[in-house]
């Protein structure tokens, strides 16, 4: 959980640069501090350098896919798992269904509703976005 007054940090992992940047821009606009990574290898390097309140990862990526990233986080940064979610366009791929059922983390299927993304990020981070807090006078 983020200390009061500090912006929640989010890591967006997606090999589709346009999608990663769109999500980052939308979350930044809501008051989150957002970094992006194009694959699981870069994401692991970012996690070694900085603490993140939420990690959003695509499933299908080159180098290290979402499944591999999840397993590496499980081994190296298990505290992050309760703040992890998938964003994916692979709802039709049965290869991942058993894995997703096993790990029991939130999954948003592309295209997704941005309000649902905001709700899940807020829920996982345990922090109210700075933009919303400023409006409510918190």
Feature roles, as predicted:
Residues 1-9, 113-138:
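Non-catalytic signal-transmission and effector/linker regions of two-component phosphorelay proteins
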Residues 21-29:
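Charged docking surfaces used in two-component/phosphorelay signaling
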Residues 31-38, 46:
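Short hydrophobic/Thr-rich beta-strand motif most characteristic of the beta2 strand and flanking loop
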Residues 38-42, 65-71:
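Acidic catalytic/metal-coordinating carboxylates
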Residues 48-50, 73-82, 102:
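Conserved phosphotransfer cores of two-component systems
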Residues 58:
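Active-site residues of response regulator receiver
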Residues 61:
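Receiver (REC) domain active-site loop signature in two-component systems and cognate sites
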Residues 68, 81, 90-109, 115, ...:
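Alpha4 helix (beta4-alpha4-beta5 surface) of REC/receiver domains from two-component response regulators
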